[in-house]
Amino acid sequence: MITGIQITKAANDDLLNSFWLLDSEKGEARCVVAKAGFAEDQIVPVNKLGEIEYREIPMEIQPEVRVEGGQHLNVNVLRRETLEDAVKHPEKYPQLTIRVSGYAVRFNSLTPEQQRDVIARTFTASL
């Protein structure tokens, strides 16, 4: 079973307030987002997280689309640093796909000007 968690207390400060998907059957944790020390989608054994306290995050899984139609939502979870590194080292990110005006595109296929524009429009200093 997969459980979503937010780590609220940990010996490793990089884990504080990070979000993970725990797979109890495999004994693995997949990083959704962390301040540092762990990459997005990195899978680690649960015991590598050390002594932690967490709160469960409700997850809704719908096995099928309703009869009246479905909704589609694409959410990109990225850090500014990831896109900036992709600009400098595109060979490290051949599969990096982002949403631009409702379309999915490979970040590396954009011109440098478009890449800068995406970074500027996507990330703000505050809400």
Swiss-Prot record:
The gene is grcA. Acts as a radical domain for damaged PFL and possibly other radical proteins. Residues 5-127 form the Glycine radical domain. GO terms for molecular function: formate C-acetyltransferase activity. The modification Glycine radical is found at G102. The keyword NAD does not apply. Keywords: Organic radical. The keyword Methyltransferase does not apply. It comes from Enterobacter sp. (strain 638). GO terms for cellular component: cytosol. InterPro entries: Auton_GlycylRad_Cofactor, Form_AcTrfase_GR_CS, Gly_radical, Glycyl_radical_cofactor_GrcA. SUPFAM superfamilies: PFL-like glycyl radical enzymes (SSF51998). This is Autonomous glycyl radical cofactor. It comes from the Bacteria. NCBIfam families: spare_glycyl.
